[in-house]
Amino acid sequence: TSSFLVPRDTKGLTVARCNETLGCRFMNNGELVFEDMFVPDDHLLVEGTALAKAGVYFQPGKIIQAAKNLGVGVRCLEVTSDYVQNYMQGGRILIKHQAVALRLAEMATRIEAVRALLERASEAVDEGAADADALCNMVKYYASEEIMKVATHAAELHGGNGMMLDFGVEKLFRDAAIFPHMDGTVDISKFKIVKALYPATAGKYAGRED
């Protein structure tokens, strides 16, 4: 595969439409159409090995997505902690209810587990470690699933207010729902983890089964 630089004003390149997303609306998601488009030779960036070279950027990309996701989780815990320590129900603040307190403990633990794995994966990428690819995919999928649980607890602990625009929790919930699908799905990350851990039997160049 080869890669080319295509300026936005290139004849034959059009943006068919831009899609709105459930969450993470800071992104621009557009459908590109290439029709009878001429790209000059001097716009060639990488010849023959573009996909392999692009893979170098997949690792930090997953780190960045996991870090954004962690930020969503941290904010979920912040706003929920404030809410349950001030909102009264049945004559008591919410945090005095055992079920509420247990959910807070789960949220905090999940956030710290994601943070620890994110730090380890980041160090592996910086050091060029052999297990960097596996760790990047681990933190991508783990953060996606765990922070979604954190956001769900945040919405639940706000009760009906969790679905109200004024409280902001619904936005965090929508953002958390996007991350499992960014930079590859969770299942794709799991496949990559297995291939990295067991290259001889599950990897791209594994031998044929007899």
Identify the role of each PLM range.
Residues 76-83, 120, 124, 153, ...:
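Generic, well-ordered alpha-helical scaffold segments in large soluble proteins
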Residues 1, 29, 60, 99, ...:
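Active-site lining segments that contact anionic ligands and/or coordinate catalytic metals
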Residues 96, 100, 133-141, 162-178:
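Charge-rich, acidic-biased intrinsically disordered regions
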Residues 81-95, 108-142, 155-160:
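C-terminal helix-coil-helix/basic helical segment that borders enzyme active sites and/or dimer interfaces
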Residues 6-8:
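Conserved H-D interstitial segment of serine endopeptidase catalytic domains
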Residues 146-154:
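Hydrophobic alpha-helical segments of membrane proteins
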Residues 3, 13-112, 179, 195, ...:
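Glycine-rich beta->alpha junctions and the first turn(s) of the following alpha-helix
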Residues 158-210:
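Glycine-rich phosphate/cofactor-binding loops in nucleotide/flavin-utilizing enzymes
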